[in-house]
């Protein structure tokens, strides 16, 4: 069984600024992510990290190349329509701006356990709160953060909460 869940092949993206002026944000980028692998895209400001993420999440249509998710070419619009439900439920990305991706009215415990509740995921721990505490410990935060709101956390703490949620 092939364990590649995300494959980006020769991805390019160009932003058209005016009729005559365009900026090439991505040029011939290729990579694979395997099941269970934690993958990070690192680069300088303006290097295209967010553009890659937005292409993978179908927020931008690439100007070249292909993006394959679980064997489906998501750059092919007919394939996206055919597999819409699977594509909407199986991807999670953590952006650098981790604070804006969290519901600011939810406590950390709820931020972490919301995907488990939505997708009916069972864990070895007895309660969702115990699972959230376990996930926080895994990323180097203790259970005292469970009842805090995202606005009360530093940027690094919010990022770790997002990792715990994923």
Segments the model singles out, each with a brief description of its role:
Residues 19-20, 74-92, 110, 118, ...:
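ABC ATPase NBD coupling module
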Residues 42-44:
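The feature captures the beta-strand-to-loop junction immediately N-terminal to the Walker
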Residues 149-153, 157:
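Conserved ABC ATPase signature
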Residues 163:
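Hydrophobic anchor residue at the start of the ABC signature
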Residues 57:
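Helix-to-loop junction immediately C-terminal to a conserved catalytic motif
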Residues 126-144:
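Conserved ABC ATPase "signature" region
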Residues 65-76:
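Conserved ABC transporter NBD signature motif
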